[in-house]
Amino acid sequence: MKKIELGHHSEAAKPDCIKALIVEFITTFLFVFAGVGSAMATDSLVGNTLVGLFAVAVAHAFVVAVMISAGHISGGHLNPAVTLGLLLGGHISVFRAFLYWIDQLLASSAACFLLSYLTGGMGTPVHTLASGVSYTQGIIWEIILTFSLLFTVYATIVDPKKGSLDGFGPLLTGFVVGANILAGGAFSGASMNPARSFGPALVSGNWTDHWVYWVGPLIGGGLAGFIYENVLIDRPHVPVADDEQPLLN
């Protein structure tokens, strides 16, 4: 079992941490910009249809795959739930995870404010539960979808025994994100990412059901990270050094 390291505030001044935070901000910004932008475009062009859902799923799949690959300096988390899953697996310190969460929320907010400006004040679509879907059902949806996302991250990127999958992790993770949006988009919205939900809610001022997209993804991501690392991976404990980069690759 890997030990969770608290870290130290001195990490924030280390060059590797600063670089990681810059890259994490850029990749999360671009991910949210493309993801929310695709949702705004499809809503304007085709409305709330199956074609629109498919287009949004494909856009998210591609941008997740590319941004994880491009974000090798930070690990390309893009998502507080991914960061939590890696934290509970012992791959990032508590302090650096906290910095990542702030980074991700700021990046998402900046992307959505810019989208609102560039589209002449169009509303940023928020994640809400579909009619007839209860809070409990929505949370379970998000737990399962985010669990599958983190399970894929561990199986294809983190696991040292990934073998022939080495190098394909970002692409396969993107596929899972797209598939999950197709599966759950019509019911819970398939957020899987508190930061992805936070930016649009902040810009639109619509916080309806917003807490669901923190509770569900954080539980699902945390469970997947803890279970995969401590049950499915067999290796001795190696403490996280202060200057260690929390990479996914």
Swiss-Prot record:
The modification N6,N6-dimethyllysine is found at K3. The keyword Cell division does not apply. It is found in: Vacuole membrane. Residues 1-20, 71-105, 159-166, 234-249 are cytoplasmic. A motif (NPA 1) lies at residues 79-81. Expressed in roots. It holds the Pfam family MIP. This is Aquaporin TIP4-1. The lineage of its organism: Eukaryota, Viridiplantae, Streptophyta, Embryophyta, Tracheophyta. The gene is TIP4-1.
